[in-house]
Amino acid sequence: MSRYVEKVRETKETKVQVKLELDGEGKVEIRTPVPFFDHMLHSMLFYMKVNATILGEDKQGYDDHHIVEDVGITLGQAIKDALGDRRGIKRFSSAVIPMDEALVLVAVDVSGRGYASTNLDLKREKIGDLSTENVAHFFWSLATNAGITLHVRKLDGVNEHHIVEAAFKGVGLALGEACSIQGEGIRSTKGSL
């Protein structure tokens, strides 16, 4: 079963192209107009162990909100499509990621039900060119469109770059493991996801 998909989302504000192979080796190419976001996406997808290309164009140039949101939507839809009926996936996973003084907990359920709760206690307005409010918004857009339940929590840390990077790495690690094939059946007492 191929778990490869290509998705394109084009609006008056953005154009986002995603190529995603869930059973990859972490070969990633990211190009959006928000370099710090590119760095975070690259970390997430590398630790997810997928092969991915994400190309994002911001047609309006107002701020980073639209491109971050639309990448989350498109990548989430690509993950959902690549998972198919979710037969054989591990489904649940979690990760606790240290990055120097920062420590972040991530928990994932690839259930078909989209939800995200993010609490990183970020105080700065921006990290590089990424508005910190868009970190939680990206995770929400990703999770609701992928049909996953996602919880991201800061346990410790003061350096917000480290906190955000640990969060993206943790999401990648936990999501990659939860999407991995572990058997043949559907991991649900209901018999479907």
UniProtKB/Swiss-Prot annotation:
One of its GO terms (cellular component) is cytoplasm. GO terms for molecular function: imidazoleglycerol-phosphate dehydratase activity. Its main location: cytoplasm. GO terms for biological process: L-histidine biosynthetic process. It catalyses: D-erythro-1-(imidazol-4-yl)glycerol 3-phosphate = 3-(imidazol-4-yl)-2-oxopropyl phosphate + H2O. It is an enzyme of class 4 (lyase). Pathway: Amino-acid biosynthesis; L-histidine biosynthesis; L-histidine from 5-phospho-alpha-D-ribose 1-diphosphate: step 6/9. Its EC number is 4.2.1.19. The keyword Cytoplasm applies. It is found in: Cytoplasm. Disulfide bonds: none annotated. Keywords: Amino-acid biosynthesis, Cytoplasm, Histidine biosynthesis, Lyase. Belongs to the imidazoleglycerol-phosphate dehydratase family. This is Imidazoleglycerol-phosphate dehydratase.
